Amino acid sequence: MDELQGHIAKAIDKFRAKIAEDENLRKELADITRNVNVDTTDNEGFSFILDKGEIKDFKKGKLPTAEITLHATTLDFKLLFTGELKPMKAWATKRLKFDASLDDVMRLKKLIS
């Protein structure tokens, strides 16, 4: 497992803990299924499936179709996961981009905050 993959795995663990303790978030995600790609613009990227509040099939490589795609360099993702780069600053400076519906963007904000 490379360094970025480890950071993403830790973020998934935090997400699972957040879901376990937040009943409102569980209810909000109960009927949601999304394919998610983490596109490292300088590498092959990662993917997972958000399925009714659970993250499944986290792996290296991108899914052929995804409702949510996050784009950044490997370094910027590492800085985001270590807290050295704040998500809103990364987005405002276009170091973090995403392809997703507005509803999904708002859900992502809840999950990473």
Residue ranges and their predicted role:
Residues M1-S113:
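Feature captures hydrophobic
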